[in-house]
Amino acid sequence: MREVLGTALTSSSQKALLLGSGELGKEVVIELQRLGVEVVAVDRYDRAPAMHVAHRRYVIDMLDYDQVVDVVRRERPDVIIPEVEAINTDALVDLEKEGYFVVPNARAVKITMNRIELRRLAAEKVGVPTTRYAFAHNEDEAAEACEKVGYPCLIKPEMSSSGHGHTLASSPEEAREGFKRALKEARGKSERAIVEEFVEIDRELTALTYRHDTGNGIETVPLPPVEHKRPKGIYYYYESWHPATVNDEVVKKAKDIAVKVVNELGGLGIFGVEILVTKDGRVLFSEVSPRPHDTGLVTLASMELSEFAIHARAVLGLPVPEPKLLTPAASRVVLAEEALEPPCLKGVGEALKVKGVQLRWFAKPRSYKERRMGVLLATGSTVEEALERVRRAAGFLKVVKC
């Protein structure tokens, strides 16, 4: 457990280097700055959100081994914080061997980026419930795997996020095409796909769970789950609310799954464990991110400490007694409709007239269709009231050319 904090930009400072500098990273940087940490923000493009609040910034290809290693060795940070999936994980493994602290650890980052390795860990090693699944190395194996798990089946790249490369297949022909799409749209190099049972989803939860140093050892703490919803045909986060509107039995099962998976991954910091609640009553592990989760943006309004504050404290080796859920809250993303450079946000005044509403405008340098440009947050006496407020405010906003 850490007892001393230094001063940024002096020889006493603790230094954090973010690999990925999006909107989630920006909130982490703000929390680190509050603790006097010197922060370096790295991303594949300039003027990314977290770069706006960091002390220094670098633009590199984060999938390139040498570029990742070079920027870390140049800055020599006390902690490396991966904020996105598109990172060369072999570089992180080797940097950890050199003595650098990777959050939560290089093994966890590498496993969670790979759907096949993650499913093996969760279902086969830890033994938590998941959908039926099989792995495919070619088009014919994808068709055979769909026969095994049953049609319709979901085909996903070994490495991807936010629905990229997903196909719902109802025939062997569609399964073969789905495999080709999975490889084409994978993030990074991918030669395999995972084929999963298609389930009718009733609810989707994020079981935010963190590990911190209490001074007497590492403790794992599950938080009240966040619930989120994606309109039909949309795979990315669109709207979330907190606490989840599910019964206590589902909450307990979700927390139990999350704790088991997170303990196996180890390290320090917060994890976003994605849970599916099916219409036939099953509570299933889906995926996990070893970092703050986009659906957890709602905790900026709902909790005593947001997921970002928790992450910042935990990765610095500071204790984080379980924070309170202060109020029901909801979030809704602000999406762009077209490519614009630079983009501006119109309708802000009217949106902020809605009681209980806050806005985070990420100030990304350019937009494209359906790019997440901001998020609205709202509190209320109930989740339903918070959702009504955030949806009403969203109706006023539009991303436009400046």
Curated annotation (Swiss-Prot):
GO cellular component: cytosol
Pathway per the UniProt entry: Purine metabolism; IMP biosynthesis via de novo pathway; N(2)-formyl-N(1)-(5-phospho-D-ribosyl)glycinamide from N(1)-(5-phospho-D-ribosyl)glycinamide (formate route): step 1/1
Reactions accelerated catalytically: N(1)-(5-phospho-beta-D-ribosyl)glycinamide + formate + ATP = N(2)-formyl-N(1)-(5-phospho-beta-D-ribosyl)glycinamide + ADP + phosphate + H(+)
Subunit structure: Homodimer.
Annotated InterPro entries: ATP-grasp, ATP-grasp_carboxylate-amine, ATP_grasp_subdomain_1, PreATP-grasp_dom_sf, PurT, PurT/PurK_preATP-grasp, PurT_C
Enzyme Commission number(s) from the entry: 6.3.1.21
Binding residues for ATP: 115, 156, 196-199, 204
Biological classification of the source: Archaea, Thermoproteota, Thermoprotei, Desulfurococcales, Desulfurococcaceae
Keyword Ligase: yes
Gene: purT
GO molecular function, one term: magnesium ion binding
Name the record gives this protein: Formate-dependent phosphoribosylglycinamide formyltransferase
Species annotation: Ignicoccus hospitalis (strain KIN4/I / DSM 18386 / JCM 14125)
Keyword Magnesium: yes
Occurrences of domain ATP-grasp (ranges): 120-316
Entry-linked PROSITE patterns: ATP_GRASP
Residues reported in the UniProt entry to bind N(1)-(5-phospho-beta-D-ribosyl)glycinamide: 23-24, 83, 294, 364, 371-372
Protein role: Involved in the de novo purine biosynthesis. Catalyzes the transfer of formate to 5-phospho-ribosyl-glycinamide (GAR), producing 5-phospho-ribosyl-N-formylglycinamide (FGAR). Formate is provided by PurU via hydrolysis of 10-formyl-tetrahydrofolate.
Family: Belongs to the PurK/PurT family.
Top EC class for this record: ligase
